[in-house]
From Swiss-Prot:
Lineage: Bacteria, Pseudomonadati, Pseudomonadota, Gammaproteobacteria, Alteromonadales
Pathway as given in its UniProt record: Lipid metabolism; fatty acid beta-oxidation
Xref: Pfam families: 3HCDH, 3HCDH_N, ECH_1
Gene designation per UniProt: fadJ
Job of this protein: Catalyzes the formation of a hydroxyacyl-CoA by addition of water on enoyl-CoA. Also exhibits 3-hydroxyacyl-CoA epimerase and 3-hydroxyacyl-CoA dehydrogenase activities.
Annotated EC: 4.2.1.17, 5.1.2.3, 1.1.1.35
Region (3-hydroxyacyl-CoA dehydrogenase): 308-706
Family per record: In the N-terminal section; belongs to the enoyl-CoA hydratase/isomerase family.
Oligomeric form and interacting partners: Heterotetramer of two alpha chains (FadJ) and two beta chains (FadI).
HAMAP family assigned to the protein according to its UniProt record, in alphabetical order: FadJ (MF_01617)
Cellular component GO terms, alphabetical: cytoplasm
Subcellular location: Cytoplasm
GO BP terms in the entry: fatty acid beta-oxidation
UniProt keyword annotations, A-Z: Cytoplasm, Fatty acid metabolism, Isomerase, Lipid degradation, Lipid metabolism, Lyase, Multifunctional enzyme, NAD, Oxidoreductase
Protein's recorded name: Fatty acid oxidation complex subunit alpha
Amino acid sequence: MEKTFNLTRRDDGIAILTMDVPGETMNTLKAQFGPEISEILAEIKSDPHIRGLVLISGKKDSFVAGADISMLDACKTAGDAKALSQQGHVVFNELEALKIPVVAAIHGACLGGGLELALACHQRVCSDDGKTMLGVPEVQLGLLPGGGGTQRLPRLVGITTALDMMLTGKQIRSKQALKMGLVNDVVPQTILLQTAVEMALTGKRAPKPVKKSLVNQVLEGTSFGRNIIFDQATKQVEKKTQGNYPAPAKIIDCVRQGIAKGMQKGLEVEASHFAELVVSKESEALRSIFFATTEMKKETGAEGATPRKVKKAVILGGGLMGGGIASVTTTKAKIPVRVKDISEKGLSNALAYAYKLLDKGVKRRHMTPAARDNLMALMTTTTEYKGVKDADIIVEAVFEDLALKHQMVKDIERECGEHTIFASNTSSLPISQIAEAATRPENVIGLHYFSPVEKMPLVEVIAHAKTSPETIATTVAFARKQGKTPIVVQDGAGFYVNRILALYMNEAAQLLLEGQSVEHLDKALVKFGFPVGPITLLDEVGIDVGAKISPILEKELGERFKAPAAFDKLLGDDRKGRKNGKGFYQYGASSKKTKAVDETVYGVLGIKPGTNKDAKALAERCVVQMLNEAVRCLDDGIIASPRDGDIGAIFGIGFPPFLGGPFHYIDTLGAANLVKILESYQSQFGNRFEPCERLKTMARENVSFF
């Protein structure tokens, strides 16, 4: 059996320990490595000729990308998970206790358990390559660093910096890591090993004291000050997580106890808290999302189909969506883009939008001005159909006007090649209707982005009955290159995300008309776990957009999609939301950082806010509508699987990740319980709450989705 760790000795007395997991593109730590590492460490200790040790990766662009997450699923109890953490502690403590200097030579991803391994070394040097990133992202999986990270990191970089890294899961670039004292040196990759060897030959060096602000020195230097840091961090965590994620509070406790009671006690607390989190429902849900997205990356979207290579893209429309799509195509996919708009102003806006996003990277020193300009050079503009002939894909991002889209399909078929894909960014029009104007309908597909394009990770790839498998596979691959998570959905009004969102939003509007205040409604759904409340979301998306989509959904899908009268009243008062500075909330220069409700909106709606109902009950009434409709979408074949439905809702509308998505949440609630809740609402508020047939069947047969 091939070994993962290979020890070689140099003539100068430095041993090189190379980690290279057989058959994997990246190194990950596995439970079975413990005995192998211990054996090697025993060999090193028994050899008096070894003067120093350098740890390096045998992989091209990865030091250690973290622990193998799948081994956590093998933990049947908290005891199993605790043993896993303790095993890591034993090995890393053994490494740290070596009398000879130990240096980690880091190139590529150094994350999670990989950084904890590096922290157990006496010194760290990393490459200045852009691929080198350091971090402890465990919190994003509902976990904490379980290999000593909660103890070694604060001792190395300071409590405040360590908490920031662990509570956000952010990844740190080389130069930043050097500045904060996380690594001892940053060098070009070509001399990484040589530098690490020289560091090992020089002998152990005490880490340089981290430069801290006077305030931080005072706070971290006294027990009173440290308590202020921990209390402040706890308040911020409670505000951000709304109590829905247990990991951050446990991370703070690990650091607090370790600093107050010593390293050994800190490691004991870390192992216990790690174990509790591994078996928590929140972490299980977050890990299911991780596995689902990893699995989806291997799929083409159309079984057996090979995607065509996209060498050039054309974006029709230079508005907010068009500019955003053009931007991610050049900056993420590195694909040349031609933006076409009927006006020079639209084109200028698209270029300015892309430049502004790239310039942020320059200001943060993530890229050079030259790199920004090179990416901008990939984007060209035109007001005519010039320079579009050789395009592999056309992404249309114009108004929701079927006649206009028909004209564009005809124009593209006339101007471009027979394999050119026409992808529409429509949010409401069925793709089959757009394809009616095509002589090559197999090339027509939907590609629905969410706003703002550069931030929202999801795209819906919408296939109609005649879309070819090759078109689907090519569009999915194109979206992935843009840094998106695509889900393939079938054609139908609202597709998947807008369809489940519409009922949720309608119910929130209904509650508003029943006398619930805007603020209370929004807070109730944020407390439930959504990033923003439904009324804030309506202001952001545009009240006019919601009003336009609702009749289409009602016509195609039935009366349950009938929008409350609120929309018409708001539009009658020219309230479109943030876009025109007039909606449910106050906008403009005078508005404070914390948005205030525009109280005049109640008069427009002809209501007076009454007694606020229980927040949990309000959230439930909105959310069960979404759950019921998600199952209908599965029944109608709009989505291919519960997995796709979960990912679509989480990445498209911010469904609470700790619940795992609508289908995971239904399993948690139990189908029978959900049916009972829906039937109770149906008796009070009418047939829009009628449970779908599949849910009733699942309730009767006591089955789940996963």
